[in-house]
Amino acid sequence: DEDFAATSDATFSYCPADRIESLPNGDIDLAVNVASMQEMTLAAVAGYFKLLRKRRTRIFYCCNRLEKRLSGGELLRFMDYPWLTADVHLVDEACPWHQWFFGRSRAPRVRVGGVAIPLVHRYDGVHWHRLTRLAQGS
């Protein structure tokens, strides 16, 4: 749909990864990415960061797997994203809410007191999250 992004006076815009360059011009108060940068190449992630810094994004929340090997063989690491030393991480830790999922799967099940909980499974990698005040620059 061509109208995926909000108009320039909107307070919220949803933007699919392949349309990020189509966001309306202007500063971004808060950008959020949950479990999708881990599906991109490092070059695509770098493009996101470049755009966020260009748009003077004030706060960026990022929650993605610490490490993931992409189907093409590239190993993507959260800590290798193009963070700057001048970025200020307000939260920087293993994400307490994104370590498991509901569904039918062969993935390991979450256990409480040694008892497997039906339909609750652990992801095959730790998810990390950062709430960051992005430094401006490249």
Language model features with spans:
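S-adenosyl-L-methionine
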Residues: 1-24
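Rossmann-like AdoMet/SAM-dependent catalytic core
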Residues: 17-20, 75, 80-138
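Flexible loop/turn segments at secondary-structure boundaries
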Residues: 21-22, 39-40, 68-71
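Short, conserved loop/helix-junction motifs that constitute active-site signature segments
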Residues: 26, 51-56
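A conserved beta-strand element that flanks and buttresses the S-adenosyl-L-methionine
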Residues: 32
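Short catalytic micro-motifs in class I SAM-dependent methyltransferases
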Residues: 35-36
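A short, conserved alpha-helix within the catalytic core of class I
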Residues: 39-52
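Conserved beta-strand signature within the Rossmann-like core of class I S-adenosyl-L-methionine
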Residues: 56-68
